[in-house]
Swiss-Prot record:
It comes from the Viruses. The keyword Hydrolase applies. Plays a role in the inhibition of type I interferon signaling pathway. Mechanistically, specifically interacts with 2',3'-cGAMP and cleaves it via its phosphodiesterase activity. In turn, prevents 2',3'-cGAMP interaction with host ER-resident STING1 leading to inhibition of downstream signaling pathway and type I interferon production. It is found in: Virion. One of its GO terms (biological process) is symbiont-mediated suppression of host type I interferon-mediated signaling pathway. It comes from African swine fever virus (isolate Tick/Malawi/Lil 20-1/1983) (ASFV). Its main location: virion. This is Uncharacterized protein C129R. It is an enzyme of class 3 (hydrolase). GO terms for molecular function: hydrolase activity. Coiled coil: none annotated. The keyword Cell cycle does not apply.
Amino acid sequence: MEHPSTNYTPEQQHEKLKHYVLIPKHLWSYIKYGTHVRYYTTQNVFRVGGFVLQNPYEAVIKNEVKMAIRLQNSFNTKAKGYVTWTVAYNDISKLYAKPDAIMLTIQENVEKALHALNQNVLTLASKIR
């Protein structure tokens, strides 16, 4: 069953993708259980996504086995409105994941180190002139 899409303006999409990281396709299968993802379909429809339940997941879609990601909207399977759904990798054009605190810390540290390195290069360049 196809879920009716909610149309989001480009501004709303941008806001919903804040703090999410675009994942290159060759790394999709490494996204872990529990990670929250958002995505664009191959028809360029923005989806707010859900939490990874299984990935990678071999799904039979229209009598064909496809690599897919299985998502859920909650971790409480007894919650009212709990649903799971499968999205084939081939039906996704862009996949974004919300990094955990460890990854955000690593990213922050890399950015600080890069900034310090750039400052050192500028200092050395000014001394050479």
